[in-house]
Amino acid sequence: MGTEDCDHEGRSVAAPVEVTALYATDGCVITSSLALLTNCLLGAEPLYIFSYDAYRSDAPNGPTGAPTEQERFEGSRALYRDAGGLNGDSFRVTFCLLGTEVGVTHHPKGRTRPMFVCRFERADDVAVLQDALGRGTPLLPAHVTATLDLEATFALHANIIMALTVAIVHNAPARIGSGSTAPLYEPGESMRSVVGRMSLGQRGLTTLFVHHEARVLGAYRRAYYGSAQSPFWFLSKFGPDEKSLVLAARYYLLQAPRLGGAGATYDLQAVKDICATYAIPHDPRPDTLSAASLTSFAAITRFCCTSQYSRGAAAAGFPLYVERRIAADVRETGALEKFIAHDRSCLRVSDREFITYIYLAHFECFSPPRLATHLRAVTTHDPSPAASTEQPSPLGREAVEQFFRHVRAQLNIREYVKQNVTPRETALAGDAAAAYLRARTYAPAALTPAPAYCGVADSSTKMMGRLAEAERLLVPHGWPAFAPTTPGDDAGGGTAAPQTCGIVKRLLKLAATEQQGTTPPAIAALMQDASVQTPLPVYRITMSPTGQAFAAAARDDWARVTRDARPPEATVVADAAAAPEPGALGRRLTRRICARGPALPPGGLAVGGQMYVNRNEIFNAALAVTNIILDLDIALKEPVPFPRLHEALGHFRRGALAAVQLLFPAARVDPDAYPCYFFKSACRPRAPPVCAGDGPSAGGDDGDGDWFPDAGGPGDEEWEEDTDPMDTTHGPLPDDEAAYLDLLHEQIPAATPSEPDSVVCSCADKIGLRVCLPVPAPYVVHGSLTMRGVARVIQQAVLLDRDFVEAVGSHVKNFLLIDTGVYAHGHSLRLPYFAKIGPDGSACGRLLPVFVIPPACEDVPAFVAAHADPRRFHFHAPPMFSAAPREIRVLHSLGGDYVSFFEKKASRNALEHFGRRETLTEVLGRYDVRPDAGETVEGFASELLGRIVACIEAHFPEHAREYQAVSVRRAVIKDDWVLLQLIPGRGALNQSLSCLRFKHGRASRATARTFLALSVGTNNRLCASLCQQCFATKCDNNRLHTLFTVDAGTPCSRSAPSSTSRPSSS
């Protein structure tokens, strides 16, 4: 029930209407207000009430308790007159200025602060108030003082009067006591005694104001900071249109703090946005007032009080509409949050993809067309809730249909492949099939066990000489000549990166060239052996302690590689009889390998010995792939117990084979019997690594792949099929320098047998794995991009396997498991049974088998022995099916958008909403530069060096001297960027450029490669970026980092100076 007052005769009287009024004066509002409070009318000015809120404290409840929305509207509607002003016999008006009162934490802060309270109860006083509220008539000081409620008013000012009295009258000397209840300000006198003698109320404030006017004014101006606002400030803040000036100002300043709820937490711009969809019909104003003419508070007050939005149903309905609008917004966007929260736990993608997914989800939900549709749906043309014209918004439903439904398809591997993969294959039969396999897979003898090694192996420097000699012999027979590196092309500092790239690609070309008739193959000139058969595997060998070597093998003693990590057949048979369950048998056999602790040769061997310690197969994009070899690098939150890891690998196998069945539909793949071979890098020691942060970069636990922005010599490009050197998920390309080595801090664990249930794996940060899946007959795979697609589909299938995720999900940091950079032409991957070379030159982290036996394996000893068969773990091994197949199918493209649904969606959205992005070729064409013409690109980049050097001088002044005489050499040219290496001049003091990101020790100070990258930025403008690849550990493991980017400017600015001019501000 509402509260009631009683008159002196005991009759019931309704409570007055509560009004909160925001007022202003022509002069200083604080001075005028203090004059009113102290009853000094000479200094008071008339008050303008330009915004107000009204409500009844005795509003009745509905029949079922809390009033309904329509009942609330009717109750508020009864207060606002259609002609302006308020209905009611008496009013309690709280006059406010802008200011903040200290409040409780869980309640929103008020946006206004009350100054005084007046009661308008007599008919004459009510008429004056109605004129002020309905017509904007100024309220005279005499009317304010006549209606002032002294008790309620000075209850508002008691604290500030008390504080001023203590601070001014008693001068607040330094505290000399320490008691919290009775702090002493003078000897023998406590704060309580001081307060007890104070004069509060109107008398106390008047005394202070008369004797200390300046200090009282200053205190009140600080408390009521609204005193400094001008008419222009209010107009610019809440205007400029009439609706927001009236409704948004009233709601934001007065109604939202009173009503509370979500609306009290919305900022002013959000309230103005909601106000824009409150499209209540509005008749033209009878006057000619406009926002530009509101230059005084008198004009603003008259404009606002006579507005149709300040009266009647329009005024009563707006607070209720704000609640409905917020509820509709939250309901529609809540669907987005609900789906994201669900997907956070079940959508197993990499961190980067999940971030892309969140951005895409918000873009799909809040793209301009969808927001426009939503705003049209929530717009109302009638203030009454019962007659509201709002419609259900399709925002959440469309987001689910257009985006989340497709995301759900990613959670089913069959739907994923169906929607995103369109395989393209070519069938070959009979002699054509046999000829293709002979020409595109290793010669059988290369991977057949032999008594001794036969081939060529040498250090990179010597291999360059041998290649040059072989090519000299071949050139008269039509072999393309390799242009020697000219002095001007020298990378400086002894860095032999271009030569190393030349070695790799020239070796791969020689190894893949077929024999023509009776003429020996081209590689015979290198091996000095006319009987050699091609194609041949090419290997990279990390030397100890530094350096690289390369090899091409015609035959090898593979038993020497695997004999100490291969369980005897009798032991396998005995274990299979003792523990026939595949999981338990696999763990037992794996423990036997670990317990034996296979020995590794000491470091410092020659190339012939080192190649049996470390060996990396180099991917040859010209050959067919017969084994899907996956490089897994799993970042861990915590160590994984070996039984759990072994169980997870079983689930990995199942998910991978599910993908293989879908990618190779014509093959017969029995998921319960098909072989899948696992190898794990030996565990790290529990002691901290030897290498410090400034040493050469130590890669991940098993990051064996190679990465380098390819700067190969002439003729390399035609062999660089499907290369993606900017795949930063991969490690750096090897080189002779120690800084480019692929290192790992780990040692072989002690050779002590483990108990059956003990934790064998002690890897705490990362687990490195190699997974080998034979491509099922009758298929082979061709091309780097195709292999990347196969690997990504397999990763998606594995991550959709719930059992795999449950087994290791709590241990894994990032679900980007498979490194696809290893499938680029010229990149290498460490072979099973071989070790890494540590920073001290020692061998560590040998890849040893983990036996995951298929559930329906018919011949366990044969399956275990197959792990040691080199034909099972080489990319281009001769296929295990018939040497003369009736038919083979060459999978040469996966087509579609298998790369990522999110990437596809992002590209489509960018095209739809931001227009077509021009290619780099088109943008460079505006500068008369052709990307395929090396000299023009290098010349144009040289002209841009001036801007780069200017930025370095401004932001890296200590390194500016290094860049005074640099030259530019083309490194890599792709469709969307050009990478050029910056090389110090021959006469420079330092022949290498220093790292700009960190200060390193002397040994690692000059181990950075610096590049200038040209790419297309926003609005199809050409951008020039300075990038560095540093090889110290603290610089993020050899990743290429962009340091800064400058705008190349318009084509007319090609004449930018090439030295030290400042970059343009464009």
Curated annotation (Swiss-Prot):
Chief site of localization: host cell
Top-level taxon in the UniProt lineage: Viruses
GO biological process terms, semicolon-separated: bidirectional double-stranded viral DNA replication; DNA replication
Gene Ontology CC terms, in alphabetical order: host cell nucleus
EC number per UniProt: 2.7.7.-
Zinc finger (CHC2-type) stretch: 995-1035
Enzyme class, broadest EC rank: transferase
Chain residue ranges for the region called Disordered: 694-727
Gene Ontology MF terms: DNA-directed RNA polymerase activity; zinc ion binding
Residue ranges, compositional bias (Acidic residues): 715-725
Keywords attached to this entry: DNA replication, Host nucleus, Metal-binding, Transferase, Zinc, Zinc-finger
Pfam families documented for this protein: Herpes_UL52
HAMAP family: HSV_PRIM
Oligomer status and interactors: Associates with the helicase and the primase-associated factor to form the helicase-primase factor.
Name of this chain's protein: DNA primase
Species this chain originates from: Human herpesvirus 2 (strain HG52) (HHV-2)
